[in-house]
Curated annotation (Swiss-Prot):
Gene3D superfamilies: Alkaline Phosphatase, subunit A (3.40.720.10), BPG-independent phosphoglycerate mutase, domain B (3.40.1450.10). This is 2,3-bisphosphoglycerate-independent phosphoglycerate mutase. Coiled coil: none annotated. GO terms for cellular component: cytosol. GO terms for biological process: glucose catabolic process; glycolytic process. Mn(2+) 2 binds at residues 14, 64, 441-442. Monomer. The active site is at 64 (phosphoserine intermediate). Substrate binds at residues 125, 155-156, 187, 193, 259-262, 333. It comes from Pseudomonas putida (strain ATCC 700007 / DSM 6899 / JCM 31910 / BCRC 17059 / LMG 24140 / F1). Its cofactor is Mn(2+). It catalyses: (2R)-2-phosphoglycerate = (2R)-3-phosphoglycerate. Mn(2+) 1 binds at residues 400, 404, 460.
Length: 511
């Protein structure tokens, strides 16, 4: 007969970061006797919930989706942008078999490498550093003919800001001693996603056959001429740079956008044998057409960075080991504690139950800062007393949702409501011999005013988040923890070996 579970409860205080600055800090201002007592008597510390520690670019504030994905996965979950940037830094990019294979085929036949992509530092669809790295990879592997077909931004960047990006790539090619920008066109044409095929055809014909409305000796001259025609970056018309460059049989074509939605239409024109959206004057027999990421499972093009599937996330691993689990949150954060915490899976795992508590129907949550936290807590206390679950994962939305309103007094009340709720959970756990981990997904409520502008600060922060152990074990919190370490910590408390897929390590160590 199995022993009665004494639940391990993971309490996620959404948007509840830590700052040592007391001004405009709703946590500091709140009357929170339970939280203060736990920090004084229980093992506690801080863990990171932002930037590269959660798979985002350096200095990027965390968010709820990324936070819960990392919490549940037990490993840092890298976004495509970050995966590519990290691979470039680590050197893995230059050994990527999909990229090197395409370049080597072209080089072996004495053919050209064509690089397509949004030339921008916007970081939404692409990043110019990735295009620089691709040019370097091609040169390192012996390509003599390297051509960049640059799509100009002006949408995720200022409308006329392409000059510095063009200068960067010109300097890159000069340093490599080979390669050049072969064409310019605005993203309005090359990156359509609304089936405006006349726009896409302009980009396709420019790249494949050097068919252009305008020509220029250099990319900078082409840009200046476009500005003189009153075309901002996004709308620059097809411009051939220097001698005509065509995509010939045996050439390799590599599309360096990492975001899929605006890369699909042009890619279809290059790779679909029965393409009918516009009449292609010519379809070269390319050695390879590569997407930096998978643009669509229906587009027959290899991806240099294939989609990463998350196996053995916490919920799945608990189910495999016969453990029961409860996920509970109010409406605002229900998807986070279920779908995102489960690594992008909609369906519950075996032995998993879910409780959704409706969020209050108010215009803004500063009008009801306690939100539905008391009702959520009622159900958690009930579940603890029943002792049906090995693990309970709860999200409290207050810190984030009230923090987003920018109303300081309401944020203080939200923190005080949370303190009462946490106290009720801790009391219930003590009666049954259970344990809890208290943490957050990212910061917010600890900074309610922008120190530069003096205006309300309604966004997330890059501050670390608390990590508190509640229980009887003689442990301490190690330095350097991140959100991805939380799931391995839970498995350690449950007496389970972590799966190989979880690269995080326990935050709790023997005292």
């Amino acid at each position: 007969m199995t022993s009665t579970p004494k639940p391990l409860v993971l309490i996620i205080l959404d948007g509840f970061g830590h700052s040592d600055i007391p001004e405009h800090n709703a946590i500091f201002a709140a009357n929170k006797p339970v939280y203060d007592r736990l920090c004084a008597t229980q093992p506690h510390g801080l863990i990171s919930g932002s930037g590269m520690d959660v798979g985002l670019p350096d200095g990027q504030m965390g968010n709820s989706e990324v936070g819960h994905m990392n919490l549940g996965a037990g490993r840092v979950v890298y976004q495509d942008f970050t995966r590519v940037t990290k691979a470039i830094r680590d050197g893995e990019f230059f050994e990527n078999p999909v990229l090197t294979g395409a370049v080597d085929k072209a080089v072996g036949a004495g053919k050209a490498v064509h690089i397509l992509g949004l030339l921008s530092d916007g970081g939404v669809h692409s990043h110019q550093d990735h295009l620089v790295a691709m040019a370097k990879l091609a040169a390192q592997r012996g390509a003599e003919k390297i051509y960049l077909h640059a799509f100009l931004d002006g949408r995720d960047t200022p409308p006329r800001s392409a000059q510095s990006s063009i200068e960067l790539l010109d300097a890159t090619f000069a340093k490599l001693g080979k390669g050049r920008i072969a064409s310019l066109i605005g993203r309005y044409y090359a990156m359509d996603r609304d089936n405006r095929w006349d726009r896409v055809s302009a980009a396709y014909n420019l790249i494949v056959d050097s068919a252009a409305e305008y020509t220029a000796d250099t990319a900078l001259a082409g840009l200046e001429a476009a500005y003189a025609r009153d075309e901002s970056d996004e709308f620059v018309k097809a411009t051939r740079i220097g001698d005509a460059v065509k995509v010939e049989d045996g050439d390799a074509v590599i599309f360096m956008n990492f975001r899929a939605d605006r890369a699909r239409e042009l890619s279809r024109a290059f790779v679909e044998p029965d393409f009918t959206e516009f009449a292609r004057a010519r379809l070269p027999k390319m050695a390879a057409y590569i997407g930096l990421t998978q643009y669509s499972a229906k587009i027959p093009a290899p991806a240099a960075f294939a989609p990463s599937s998350l196996n053995n996330v916490l919920g799945e691993y608990l189910a495999k080991n016969g453990k029961t689990q409860l996920r509970i949150a109010e409406t605002e954060k229900y998807a986070h504690v279920t779908f995102f915490f489960s690594g992008g899976r909609e369906e519950p795992f075996e032995g998993e139950e879910r409780i959704l508590i409706p969020s209050p129907k108010v215009a803004t949550y500063d009008l009801q800062p306690e939100m539905s936290a008391p009702e959520v807590t009622d159900r958690i206390v009930e579940a603890i007393e029943q002792q049906r679950f090995d693990v309970i994962v709860v999200n409290y939305a207050n810190g984030d949702m009230v923090g987003h309103t920018g109303v300081f007094e309401a944020a203080v009340k939200a923190v005080e409501a949370l303190d009462t709720c946490v106290g009720r959970i801790v009391d219930a756990l003590e009666k049954v011999g259970g344990e809890a981990l208290i943490t957050a997904d990212h910061g917010n409520v600890e900074q309610m005013e922008d120190e530069c502008t003096g205006q309300a600060h309604t966004a997330h922060t890059t501050e670390p988040v608390p990590f508190i152990y509640v229980g009887k074990r003689n442990v301490k919190v190690r330095e350097g923890g991140v959100l991805a370490d939380v799931a391995p910590t839970m498995l350690k408390l449950l007496g389970l070996e972590k799966p190989v897929e979880m690269t995080g390590t326990s935050i709790l160590v023997d005292a």
